[in-house]
């Protein structure tokens, strides 16, 4: 009897082993499928919202630098390589001297616009990146020359966010704003003729992932 039961026991163990491997294989397949679905959902969630902008920026910038922003959601803020990061914006300091309109065009071609200062902290950060020997165009102008200053992105021109040098603006023919370092007061805004050639500062919103 013992000799007859041994093959059955071996066959039973083989069948159990086969079943276990089958269950394991199915489990792995299901997990893989879930992973793939998760990746697809994540891909569409991430790139569905930012894909259009990333696609547009790809023609201007070859790479992005991303920074962890702690517990914020989304947690990664990205700027084009060599741009400066502050708050929710990226900044590029251009050393090419151009007239105001060409400076703005240069920013637009990089997916940005001339800088708009919303806070003193923002300006304080930017001036640390500037060369005191040069002045830089801002995204602020007075197209009609009637002291009706306007930001390039339509941000309201607030009285509490104005950093003009003492006595500025002072001439209706000077319809564009620049930031310049004057001793002993330091950095401040000055109205200048738009057709003069100056350096400039570009600003764009960060890309969040």
UniProtKB/Swiss-Prot annotation:
| Residues the entry annotates as binding Ca(2+) 2 | 168, 170, 174, 190-191
At the highest ranks, the source species' classification is:
Eukaryota, Metazoa, Chordata, Craniata, Vertebrata
Q: How does it assemble?
A: Associated with FCER1G. Heterodimer with CLEC4D; this heterodimer forms a pattern recognition receptor (PRR) against fungal infection.
Q: Which InterPro entries match?
A: C-type_lectin-like, C-type_lectin-like/link_sf, C-type_lectin/snaclec_domain, CD209-like_CTLD, CTDL_fold
Task: Spell out the SMART domains in the cross-references.
Answer: CLECT (SM00034)
Q: GO MF annotations for this entry?
A: calcium ion binding; carbohydrate binding; D-mannose binding; pattern recognition receptor activity; phospholipase binding
- Positions of transmembrane segments: 21-41
**GO cellular component terms, A-Z:** external side of plasma membrane; plasma membrane
Let me know which tissues express this protein, per UniProt: Expressed in lung, spleen, lymph node, leukocytes, bone marrow, tonsils and dendritic cells. Strongly expressed in purified monocytes and weakly in B-cells. In peripheral blood cells, preferentially expressed in plasmacytoids rather than myeloids.
Read off the domain note.
A short stretch of the intracellular domain (AA 8-14) proximal to the transmembrane domain is required for association with Fc receptor gamma chain.
Give the species.
Homo sapiens (Human)
Give the GO terms filed under biological process for this record.
Answer: adaptive immune response; antifungal innate immune response; defense response to fungus; detection of yeast; innate immune response; positive regulation of canonical NF-kappaB signal transduction; positive regulation of cytokine production; positive regulation of intracellular signal transduction
Q: What is this protein called?
A: C-type lectin domain family 6 member A
